[in-house]
């Protein structure tokens, strides 16, 4: 998918060991993981009952959703500002989940994905514990790539909106034709009465015709 390709590009160009992309779900006010690749120690608190096994942790992360007011991902989405984390052990926003090597947090870069000034998601890359921290240069690379990613995502969203609108218009035309068949073609003749039928179709009334 597009997001997987963007994720791989971010990992490659910043020489990271793993990357993740999350998008905002506006209906539920959460960030949902859409792409996860490589080694990315989760910077959020794992569920207490989750076994510290690599495959179990990865699965938990891959299908995770985070409220916008929680985790470093939510903080970046809400502020609209990127973060370069070079000292995770002294950063209260980064949760250390355990002594296992694959859980030990190293350096991170978090970048908000924006369409104009609206944050639509967060992209992040990570390096393993003990490896050299990300530099300002790599932060700038991640920021530039994320800008391109946001533009590509915007094109996809715009295309989807056009297709959805076309489908709704088609359904509306069908509803309009059906409604036009409702008025009777002929009215009964009643002595002393003048009968007639009139119909005006309107759309957008409670989401229907």
Mark where each language-model region is.
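Signal-transducing coupling segments at domain and membrane junctions
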Residues: 69-74, 78-107
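A short, aliphatic-rich beta-strand micro-motif
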Residues: 106-114
């Amino acid at each position: 998918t597009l997001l997987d390709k963007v994720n791989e590009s971010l990992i490659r160009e910043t020489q990271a060991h793993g990357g993740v992309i999350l998008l905002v779900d506006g209906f539920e006010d959460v960030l949902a993981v859409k792409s996860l690749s490589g080694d990315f120690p989760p910077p959020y608190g794992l569920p207490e009952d989750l076994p510290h096994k690599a495959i179990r942790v990865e699965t938990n992360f891959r299908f995770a959703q985070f409220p916008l007011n929680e985790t470093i991902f939510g903080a970046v989405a809400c502020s609209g500002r990127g973060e370069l984390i070079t000292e995770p052990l002294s950063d209260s926003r980064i949760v250390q989940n355990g002594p296992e090597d694959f859980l030990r947090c190293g350096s991170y870069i978090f970048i908000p994905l924006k369409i104009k000034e609206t944050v639509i998601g967060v992209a992040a890359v990570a390096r393993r514990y003990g490896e050299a921290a990300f530099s300002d240069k790599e932060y700038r690379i991640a920021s530039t790539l994320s800008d391109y990613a946001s533009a590509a995502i915007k094109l996809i969203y715009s295309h989807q909106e056009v297709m959805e609108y076309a489908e709704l218009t088609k359904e509306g035309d069908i509803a309009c034709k059906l409604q036009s068949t409702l008025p009777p073609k002929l009215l009964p003749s009643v002595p002393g009465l003048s009968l007639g039928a009139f119909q005006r179709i309107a759309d957008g009334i409670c989401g229907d015709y």
